[in-house]
């Protein structure tokens, strides 16, 4: 029945951790622009679905960036918040999913957004050649990542599926800059989101350029595996787990290898 409303998405409010991630990302973007590696409006942005990516993109409201554009698969609250704030001038997607709060506002005022949105077939929104040609910056959420930059975005503890890979694979593999964000710890600190060896891998280190937690940002572009590990441990790991990961990495390096591991412990 076309009169049925969409089921609203569950979106948690931004917090200190997501604001920290946003701040690190904004600083990274500012540096890229200053060094002429990105245009002043950053170029097309893609945002993965979920509370963390949504909160991080919303953080761009407090940045100096203007005339932002989005080329994504699913448009969520952050898209419309940036449009309402005058920060984003246009967004392209294949579908819209909104919280109950924002859904009512948007769907009751579609006239206000009709010249700022376009919805395309998924074959176009996620097309690898288009993603690459447009120079998209892909920002997606990780459940965990390991010290070499391999990202698990779907399986809790490697076995329990939390969500599908969605469009993150399409965008991460083909984006100009592939960024993954997550909080450095989960379950109140009982679990580190940065691990020696990812329990499930959706995105290999070859497809990952930048990793961000509230602790900091690791720019992995052009780095060898050991350099990637050092950048991730130094910048992304929560202090509760930094000593343990440093110890693991140092002992693994003593064994040698291009990508050192102690598989019995990893």
Named regions from a protein language model:
Residues 124:
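Residues that form or immediately flank small-molecule/cofactor binding pockets and catalytic motifs
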Residues 1-121, 130, 134, 144-148, ...:
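Metallocofactor- and cofactor-centric catalytic cores in central/energy metabolism, strongly enriched
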């Amino acid at each position: 029945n076309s009169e049925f409303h969409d089921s609203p998405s569950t979106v948690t409010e931004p917090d200190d951790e997501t604001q920290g991630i946003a701040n690190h990302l904004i600083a990274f973007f500012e540096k890229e622009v200053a060094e002429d590696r990105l245009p002043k409006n950053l170029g097309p942005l893609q945002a993965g679905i979920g509370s963390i990516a949504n909160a991080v993109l919303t953080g761009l409201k407090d940045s100096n960036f203007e005339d932002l554009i989005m080329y994504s698969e699913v448009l969520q609250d952050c898209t419309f918040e940036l449009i309402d704030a005058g920060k984003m001038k246009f967004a392209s997607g294949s579908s819209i999913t909104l919280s109950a709060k924002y859904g009512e506002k948007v769907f009751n005022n579609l006239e206000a957004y009709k010249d700022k949105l376009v919805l395309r077939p998924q074959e176009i929104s996620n097309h690898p050649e288009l993603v690459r040609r447009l120079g998209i910056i892909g920002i997606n959420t990780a459940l965990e990542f390991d010290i070499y930059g391999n990202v698990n975005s779907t399986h809790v503890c490697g076995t329990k599926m939390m969500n599908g890979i969605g469009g993150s694979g399409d965008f991460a593999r083909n984006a100009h800059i592939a960024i993954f964000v997550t909080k450095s710890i989960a379950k109140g600190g009982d679990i580190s989101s940065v691990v020696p060896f990812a329990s499930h891998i959706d995105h290999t280190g070859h497809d990952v350029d930048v990793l961000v937690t509230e602790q900091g940002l690791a720019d992995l572009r052009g780095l060898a595996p050991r350099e990637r590990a050092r950048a991730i441990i130094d910048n992304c790991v929560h202090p509760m787990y930094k000593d343990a990961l440093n110890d693991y990495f140092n002992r693994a390096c003593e064994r040698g290898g291009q990508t050192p591991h102690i598989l019995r412990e990893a």
